[in-house]
Amino acid sequence: MASVKFQPRGRSKGRVPLSLFAPLRVTDEKPLYKVLPNNAVPQGMGGKDQQIGYWVEQQRWRMRRGDRVDLPSNWHFYFLGTGPHSDLPFRKRTDGVFWVAIDGAKTQPTGLGVRKSSEKPLVPKFKNKLPNNVEIVEPTTPNNSRANSRSRSRGGQSNSRGNSQNRGDKSRNQSRNRSQSNDRGSDSRDDLVAAVKKALEDLGVGAAKPKGKTQSGKNTPKNKSRSGSVQRAEAKDKPEWRRTPSGDESVEVCFGPRGGTRNFGSSEFVAKGVNAPGYAQAASLVPGAAALLFGGNVATKEMADGVEITYTYKMLVPKDDKNLEIFLAQVDAYKLGDPKPQRKVKRSRTPTPKPATEPVYDDVAADPTYANLEWDTTVEDGVEMINEVFDTQN
């Protein structure tokens, strides 16, 4: 069964405007924004300051035995201020949209319009050669398609007149074949209806049905998830100050091993990151961005490959703060190593309850060269903390 068209037929209110140019298609599985340059604007229309617009993705698929089989997407070009996203400003991050512009273009609506349904799309031409894995979809001529349909209609009528003489002898065979073809046709119509409904929902026409346990039938296309245009970057590809250790991306993967200026976190914290027990309590004593910027000192130093930014911040935490004990236990915790497992003591028949004792923490000598967290116990009302964040990223 053929794939669903991008442009729905008829004069419905939710119809998508037609592009002036034939679409592009990537032959491999890479998204368009990774293979097409950001100045790929089709030539031949508008002035120099109007060479700006966007490519929008049209998802394609086929229905095969009631299942949806994904096909390579088509990408249609629209000038800025036209098309299905005419209200978006230039470079507004949107799924399925790739913004392009040529130097000298103005970031304002071009007013170049869209194509009429009776017009043939233009073959896009570019200043530079397209990549090998990008092809132009051959445009179709609406008038020729209508002429072919009329010729097929006339041919069908003439054949029906010639076959009418033999209907008497073949009526019984036709009745049997008709019942079988109706069964097959009903399945094809169900597949087509389901595919059209899915296409209209993807284009924003009509309200999408809420997910539930009910199913329309065995031929209903399955909703297979598709990855968005913007893919999630791995932790190692992000700047260090944007990383969040979680799951397989441990503290060592994101920030390196403990030592030197990186002196916070026990072995459990390093292994589990933000999912470690007690992390939320310890993080509650970390100053926010506004506190670092407006309540501390900011120093910069120009390096060979970037600018080094150093934040210095002091804060006084009351000793009775419920999260302070957890926080202090993580400072220089890597120097203590993993605690040895304690042997289980067999309980006697008449165990004697032991008085509860408060945990005692060993004092760890601070290294004045690398230590970035210090506390002063001489303060009467609490603990004074000094936080210096070293950032050597670009």
Curated annotation (Swiss-Prot):
Family matches, as CDD domains: CoV_N-CTD, CoV_N-NTD
Key word Transferase present: no
Annotated InterPro entries: N_prot_C_CoV, N_prot_N_CoV, NCAP_aCoV, Nucleocap_CoV, Nucleocapsid_C, Nucleocapsid_N
Localisation: Virion; Host endoplasmic reticulum-Golgi intermediate compartment; Host Golgi apparatus
Alphabetized UniProt keyword annotations: ADP-ribosylation, Host Golgi apparatus, Phosphoprotein, Ribonucleoprotein, RNA-binding, Transcription, Transcription regulation, Viral nucleoprotein, Virion
Superkingdom: Viruses
Region (Dimerization): 236-338
Residue ranges annotated for the CoV N CTD domain, each copy included: 228-342
Chain positions covered by the region annotation RNA-binding: 18-148
Cited Pfam families: CoV_nucleocap
GO molecular function term, any single one: RNA binding
Span list, region Disordered: 109-190, 203-254, 339-361
Family: Belongs to the alphacoronavirus nucleocapsid protein family.
Role noted for this protein: Packages the positive strand viral genome RNA into a helical ribonucleocapsid (RNP) and plays a fundamental role during virion assembly through its interactions with the viral genome and membrane protein M. Plays an important role in enhancing the efficiency of subgenomic viral RNA transcription as well as viral replication.
This protein's name: Nucleoprotein
